[in-house]
Amino acid sequence: MLKTKVKVSAIENLSDARYCAGMGVEWLGFSMTEVPVDKFNEIRNWLSGIQIVGEAFNCSEDQIIALCEAYQPDVLEINSSVQLEKIKHLNCPKILRVNLDSDNLPALFAAARPYVDYFLLVGDSEDSLLGFEDQVEIWSAQYPIILGLS
């Protein structure tokens, strides 16, 4: 079993979902704009003890609300372009995907913290985290951080 909380993204089939669940993955992410709701529900019904994350990237706030009503994920993952005030009423934990290479992270962390449960740090390349180790440690002491690795 895993010793660290892990989120796997872009799950599209039951085989991958069951493998990840068997390994003890904490969160399984499904694109709510790419995986049909019936397939999403079919996969979800086979799983237990794992948090299902509905990924909604590059969607308007109204689209996110509609997707959450249709898919009813355990957790919602959005990117930093979303106006969090407009989706704060959604009754599920939120993961905000932030980019080390392009987002103003200190300001974003402070502004978004009242609205989100976790910050998922990603970058534009595999090397994005290089040189940020000390800063990530500082941020992790202040905010709930998940590291995104490719």
Which residue stretches match the model-derived regions?
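Conserved N-terminal beta1-alpha1 strand-loop-helix module at the mouth
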Residues: 1-150
